[in-house]
Amino acid sequence: MPNFIDRRLNPKDKSLGNRQRFLKRAREELKRTIKERVKSGKIADVDAEQNVSMPARGVNEPAFQPDSNSGERRHVLPGNREFAAGDRIPKRGGGGGAGNAGAGTGQSEDEFQFVLSREEVLDLFFEDLELPDMVKLNLKESVTFKRRRAGFSASGSPTNINVGRTMRNSYGRRIALRRPSRREIEALADEIARLETEPGGRNKHRQRLEELRQTLDSLERRRRRIPYVDPVDIRFNRFEPQPLPNASAVMFCLMDVSASMGEREKDLAKRFFVLLHLFLKRRYERIDIVFIRHTDEAGEVDENTFFYSKQSGGTVVSTALEEMLRVIRERYPANEWNIYAAQASDGENISGDSERCASLLHDELMGLCQYYAYVEIIDERETEIFGTTDNGTSLWRAYRIVDGEWPNFQMTRIAKPADIYPVFRKLFGKQPEMQLRK
C-alpha cells in the first residue's frame, strides 16, 4: 500500500491541513457564498481574493454533546436566597433558538469571516461548470513575464555588471577620499630627478629632496590603500519581471433584457461572461469590458445596470449589434485592439430582424472580431425538443449561416451551468492558431 507524504510548507501562521479540512467541511456553504458573489459582484473581480462570511456554527468540528432541550442533569450549586432544595431551575433561554420574537436574553455568535485565495475561489467557481482539468489549469495559470531593466543593484551576476555606473561610483569615491593621481606622483618624481641632476644638487638641495621623497612615499602608500575600483563601487543591472504580452483586448457583453429573460437566464449569462473574461485575462495585459443591453432599443450601460435594471420591452437584436459597431468605430479600432464579443439571448426577436443581424455580423462585425460567441439560453425541458442544431428560433437559424462561414464564430444552447463550457471548446482547440492583431 503506497504511503503519501505531504511536504508542502504551511502558510505563515497557518496550518494547511486544518485549512483544507475546514474548506472540505464547509464546501456547500462556501459554494453558495461564491455563487452569490458572482451574481452581485463585478465580472472583473471574480478571480480576486474574497472575504467570505459564514455562520459560526459551521466553523466548529462535529462533536457529540448533550441535548439542551431534553434530558436530566444533576448539579451542585452554591446556596442563594432565591431557590431552596428541590426547586426546579428553568433552562436558560438563548439567542441560538429557533426564531423567537424579540431580542432574547441568551448569547449569540457573530459570523466567522476569513479570506479565500484566488485559486480557492476559482476552484469553487469552476466546480459546477464541469471544465476539464487542463482548462482549469490554463485559466488559473499566472501570466507569463519577461525580464526588463529596472535600475541598478549592489549585488548580482558578473554577467550583469554595469561598467559605466561602476566607474562613475569609483570616480566619485576617489575624489571624496582624495586619492593621489598618477599625475601628482609623476610630477614629484620629475622634481626629484631634476634636483638630483643639477650640478651639486644633492648637497645643495638635500633638505628639499628629503621632504619630496617623504611626500612621494606618503602619496604612494595612500594610493595603494585607496583602490582604483572598490567592491562598494560595483553596480549590476537590475531586472524585474513584467507581464506579457503588451496587448489590449476589449470584451463586448451583449444581452437581451426583455421580459422573457428572468433571473435564471441572467445568472447563466453572467457565468458565461465571467468564463470568457477569465480566458481573456490570461492572454492580455489590459482588458476593457463594454456592456450593451437591448430591448427594442440598445445602449451602452454600466455593469450594475446591465444585470439588475428592471427595464423591459420588445426585442430587436440588431440594435445591439449596431451599438457595438458604433462603439468599435469610436473607441476600439481593430488594428489596435483584440475584439471579443459574447451575446446572450433567449432567441426571441422581432419578425424580419434576424436576417438583419446575420447581415451585420457577416458584412461588418466578424471581420473585426477575434471571436464571437452566441449562447441561447433555453429551459432544460427544451433540450430534447431542439435535438438538432438546425431547429430553433429565427435568430438561431440566421446565426447558423454565419457559423458556417466564419471559423471565429461559435454558437450553442445552454440550459444549466454545465452546458457553458462546450462553447469554449472550439476556442481552446484553435488557441495556438489564432493570431493577435498588432
Swiss-Prot record:
Residues 92-105 have a biased composition (Gly residues). Residues 55-107 are annotated as: Disordered. It comes from the Bacteria. Transmembrane segments: none annotated. InterPro entries: UPF0229 (IPR006698). Pfam families: DUF444 (PF04285). HAMAP family: UPF0229. Belongs to the UPF0229 family. This is UPF0229 protein Smed_1028. It comes from Sinorhizobium medicae (strain WSM419).
